């Protein structure tokens, strides 16, 4: 391994910005692939060669033919362990793997010579989502197994939690008053109320949907309680009837005596 990779200038080199990051491909088959930055929903390398931040950590992914990728590649295609997933966008010279020869600009098409594992076919299929750049110096992405990559994807691509709207007392009072008048207000009524309480019409619509669901649950629970009360009254009356009969019989005997 060249000693220049561990020089002070190489270690302290500034990390390139996300906007300037693309996937580099050097002419040498042994050149490393650099993944220093984060860009959108895909992981890209830095523009340049092996002199970037994390050039020494990642082996260069090579297609089965042994040749490299085109000189300028963008999109969501990423290679691990000689497999490439996602889309391939060729922007520069018509250069490609040995099995394809010269590759013209493909746009969102895929190179048929590059194998894709089962379950990841189709355009836009990406196995791994962006990896935080803080983790890159400590992991060799090229040596991760498929299961590890899927776990990494699940950890990083969790759905963001939506923020819950907090209504004021005045807003809740106005919404509740309108709900008592009508359970299904039209768009004009919702817009008028939204302007009155300084809310968006979408928020008012969502509140009414949730309020109707709560109202249906309360109505269902109250009906179930009334049914249970009726059943309890019937069972209690049936149990008390023999006792009443005994009392009536005793009273009849007393009257005869």
Swiss-Prot record:
- Any idea which GO molecular function terms this record carries? DNA-binding transcription factor activity, RNA polymerase II-specific; DNA-binding transcription repressor activity, RNA polymerase II-specific; RNA polymerase II cis-regulatory region sequence-specific DNA binding; RNA polymerase II-specific DNA-binding transcription factor binding; sequence-specific double-stranded DNA binding
Entry keywords, A to Z:
Developmental protein, DNA-binding, Dwarfism, Homeobox, Nucleus
GO CC, alphabetical: chromatin; nucleus; transcription regulator complex
Q: Which gene encodes it?
A: GSC
Tell me the leader sequence span. Answer: none
UniProt DNA-binding residue ranges: 160-219
**What PROSITE patterns has UniProt attached to this entry?**
HOMEOBOX_1 (PS00027), HOMEOBOX_2 (PS50071)
DNA-binding listed as a keyword: yes
What is the protein name stated in its UniProt record? Homeobox protein goosecoid
Which Pfam families does the entry mention?
Homeodomain
Location in the cell? Nucleus
């Amino acid at each position: 391994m060249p000693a220049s990779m561990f020089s002070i200038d190489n270690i302290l080199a500034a990390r390139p910005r996300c906007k300037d990051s693309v996937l580099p491909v050097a002419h040498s088959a042994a050149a490393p692939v650099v993944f220093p930055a984060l860009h959108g929903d895909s992981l890209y390398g830095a523009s340049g060669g092996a002199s970037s931040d994390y050039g020494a950590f990642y082996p260069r992914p090579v297609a089965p033919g042994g040749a490299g990728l085109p000189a300028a590649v963008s999109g969501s295609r990423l290679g691990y362990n000689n497999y490439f997933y996602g889309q391939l966008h060729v922007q520069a010279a018509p250069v490609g793997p040995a099995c394809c020869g010269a590759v013209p600009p493909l746009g969102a098409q895929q190179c048929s010579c590059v194998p894709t594992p089962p379950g990841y076919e189709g355009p836009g299929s990406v196995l791994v989502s962006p990896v935080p750049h803080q983790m890159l110096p400590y992991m060799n992405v090229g040596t991760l197994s498929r299961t590890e990559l899927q776990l990494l994807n699940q950890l990083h691509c969790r759905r963001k939690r939506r923020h819950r709207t907090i209504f004021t007392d005045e807003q809740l009072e106005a919404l509740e008053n309108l709900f008592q008048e009508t359970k299904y207000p039209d768009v004009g009524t919702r817009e008028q109320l939204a302007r009155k309480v300084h809310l968006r019409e979408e928020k008012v619509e969502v509140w009414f949907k949730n309020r109707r669901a709560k109202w249906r649950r309360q109505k269902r629970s109250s009906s179930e309680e009334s049914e249970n009360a009726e059943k309890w009254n019937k069972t209690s009356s049936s149990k008390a009837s023999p006792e009443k009969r005994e009392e009536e019989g005793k009273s009849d005997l007393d009257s005869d005596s």
